[in-house]
Amino acid sequence: MSTDILRKIEAYKREEIAAAKARLALDELKARTRDQSAPRGFLKALEAKRAAGQFALIAEIKKASPSKGLIRPDFDPPALAKAYEEGGAACLSVLTDTPSFQGAPEFLTAARQACSLPALRKDFLFDPYQVYEARSWGADCILIIMASVDDDLAKELEDTAFALGMDALIEVHDEAEMERALKLSSRLLGVNNRNLRSFEVNLAVSERLAKMAPSDRLLVGESGIFTHEDCLRLEKSGIGTFLIGESLMRQHDVAAATRALLTGAEKL
């Protein structure tokens, strides 16, 4: 996403946040988070797959995107969550942004309730209020996009997530962002292979940035991963965890496609 697009997204997000705060005071929202069952352990689920010698997949539930338009016409979050779990995914990522991705909070809640997988709120966060929102909807993890926040806000979002028992996936797409991300506490680092200015996708981005990460960090490859061969290529750089959405969302048999991606097994 170009800087201009990120600016537009931030503008409408700040309007959304102001409207949400007017509807529901922070104290009331915090009370709702206390009504939720405990977080399921997002990072823990990924590490368990890797420890078992398997690829760890964060499988994304995404109806549409700004660049591709409608991706999945027959969009059924609970059915997709069950299919991903059956196919061997470790975690879910659910889009909750409406203007750009046709996402919704209820998609996250419904998907998580339909399976036993931990779920990420995939959205653009600019205020700790949104972290409390995410937890109140059932999310186990938040996304912090370094391209869209400064260091102070990134730390504030991360601290809020940790205080709620959640994990934080820190997303970077270049060396400068990786250096900033490494100052945070989260061990979960996502490398977006999509150039945020040109939209080009290149797995070499993950291969390059992986060299900067200490061994205690869990690296997640994002964007441009379509096949088992892509997974094997990134594994050579120490990346065995992936966030994949569009390529699986377009498949008729999502469970079989997920299994094929993770294991190399032929789709039935």
From Swiss-Prot:
<dbReference type="InterPro" id="IPR011060">
    <property type="entry name" value="RibuloseP-bd_barrel"/>
</dbReference>
<protein>
    <recommendedName>
        <fullName>Indole-3-glycerol phosphate synthase</fullName>
        <ecNumber>4.1.1.48</ecNumber>
    </recommendedName>
</protein>
<keyword id="KW-0057">Aromatic amino acid biosynthesis</keyword>
<dbReference type="InterPro" id="IPR013785">
    <property type="entry name" value="Aldolase_TIM"/>
</dbReference>
<dbReference type="GO" id="GO:0000162">
    <property type="term" value="P:L-tryptophan biosynthetic process"/>
</dbReference>
<keyword id="KW-0028">Amino-acid biosynthesis</keyword>
<dbReference type="InterPro" id="IPR001468">
    <property type="entry name" value="Indole-3-GlycerolPSynthase_CS"/>
</dbReference>
<dbReference type="GO" id="GO:0004640">
    <property type="term" value="F:phosphoribosylanthranilate isomerase activity"/>
</dbReference>
<keyword id="KW-0210">Decarboxylase</keyword>
<dbReference type="Pfam" id="PF00218">
    <property type="entry name" value="IGPS"/>
</dbReference>
<keyword id="KW-0822">Tryptophan biosynthesis</keyword>
<comment type="similarity">
    <text>Belongs to the TrpC family.</text>
</comment>
<comment type="pathway">
    <text>Amino-acid biosynthesis; L-tryptophan biosynthesis; L-tryptophan from chorismate: step 4/5.</text>
</comment>
<dbReference type="GO" id="GO:0004425">
    <property type="term" value="F:indole-3-glycerol-phosphate synthase activity"/>
</dbReference>
<dbReference type="InterPro" id="IPR013798">
    <property type="entry name" value="Indole-3-glycerol_P_synth_dom"/>
</dbReference>
<keyword id="KW-0456">Lyase</keyword>
<dbReference type="InterPro" id="IPR045186">
    <property type="entry name" value="Indole-3-glycerol_P_synth"/>
</dbReference>
